[in-house]
A protein has these predicted regions:
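Short S/T/G/P-rich N-terminal loop/turn motif that feeds into the first structured element of a domain
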Residues: 1-74, 82-97
Length: 97
């Protein structure tokens, strides 16, 4: 079952987001799903919110997210955001272009 996950990063900005992406992709950047080391991502959006930065994603399954978390979790921790707890909900409907 697909899931929707939201990461809120209080006090963070685009600089942290860009640093995480650079580390997770070995500096290649993230412009297509193939740039990520783990499969299963359906959609990704990120941007500033009051007091921080938010990332919202749709994953094919919780297992796919958990596999990817093993890659980006340590990066977030290394960059000072070990306490990030995502909000995860089951997706009722996912429409992609």
């Amino acid at each position: 079952m697909a899931i929707i996950v939201t990461f809120d990063l209080p006090g963070a900005g685009q600089e942290l987001y860009d640093a995480v992406i650079a580390r997770v992709t070995d500096g290649r950047g993230f412009t297509q799903f193939a740039d990520l080391p783990n499969p299963g991502l359906v959609s990704h959006a990120a941007g500033p919110v009051d007091g921080g930065f938010r990332v919202t994603e749709v994953w094919e399954s919780l297992e796919a997210l958990e596999t990817h978390a093993k890659t980006f979790g340590p990066v977030l921790a290394d960059l000072g955001h070990a306490d990030v707890q995502p909000t995860i909900i089951p997706a009722h409907n996912v429409v992609v272009r």
